[in-house]
């Protein structure tokens, strides 16, 4: 795999982007990776490589660049948890959308990134960004995957799940049955809306906890394997077909 980290210009200042893609010139279809709350840790980088092995140009932006460039959670102590949640709650979806716009403006400068239909995948708070992206840029992003989603079903009038019924691309949402942080039972509306799509699928994975899709302490092999199996089918259909 070829990996690179760049600093690009965003409306809010310098912003890091990290790319994992196959060796060679490409161009390869683009999959935008929205990392989870703990930041772009080693488990996330390994997960990006897993997707890139399917033949994709996988790129993520530094979600927390306004506060702490390339933050990656260190341990699970109270202070670190407080810091991480502060970053999660302190970064708005409007800011993420602004960052995505900067990323999309930069992509044509890399000849390895293919133009045309794109996919996106997100974890935890990143799954919320997936739903907001298919809402705002559904014509460009033809496949979306959200694993162990956070803050996707709320009582607010702009709750991300409300965008699902109008999406015409492929969407996969995966929950863990053991997830008490963001349980599937709190996301019934999202599950029902996803399963009602022509090309949508929501699943609850038995025994999997929050974080099951990222290599690390909460990784759940069976749930991850099933989720990535479905993700690959959707990406291949929408981006390579």
Functional labels for PLM-detected ranges:
Residues 1-241:
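N-terminal cap/leader regions of alpha/beta-hydrolase-fold enzymes
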């Amino acid at each position: 795999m070829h990996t690179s980290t760049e600093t690009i210009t965003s409306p809010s200042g310098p912003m890091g982007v990290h790319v994992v893609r196959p060796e060679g010139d490409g161009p390869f279809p683009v999959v935008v990776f929205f990392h989870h709350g703990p930041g772009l840790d080693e488990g996330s980088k390994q997960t990006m490589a897993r997707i890139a092995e399917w033949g994709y140009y996988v790129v993520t932006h530094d979600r927390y660049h306004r506060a702490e460039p390339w933050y990656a959670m260190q341990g699970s102590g109270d202070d670190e948890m407080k810091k991480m949640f502060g970053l999660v709650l302190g970064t708005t979806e409007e800011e993420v959308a602004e960052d995505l716009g900067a990323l999309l403006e930069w992509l044509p400068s890399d000849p390895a990134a293919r133009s045309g239909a794109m996919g996106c995948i997100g974890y935890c708070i990143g799954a919320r960004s997936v739903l907001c992206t298919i809402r705002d840029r559904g014509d460009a992003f033809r496949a979306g995957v959200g694993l162990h989603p956070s803050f996707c079903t709320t009582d607010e009038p702009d709750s991300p799940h409300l965008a699902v019924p109008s999406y015409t691309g492929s969407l996969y949402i995966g929950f863990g049955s053991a997830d008490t942080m963001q349980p599937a039972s709190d996301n019934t509306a999202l599950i029902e809306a996803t399963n009602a799509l022509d090309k949508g699928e929501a699943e609850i994975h038995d025994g999997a906890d929050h974080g099951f899709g990222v290599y690390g302490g909460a990784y759940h092999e069976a749930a991850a394997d099933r989720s990535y199996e479905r993700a690959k089918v959707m990406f291949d259909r929408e981006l390579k077909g």
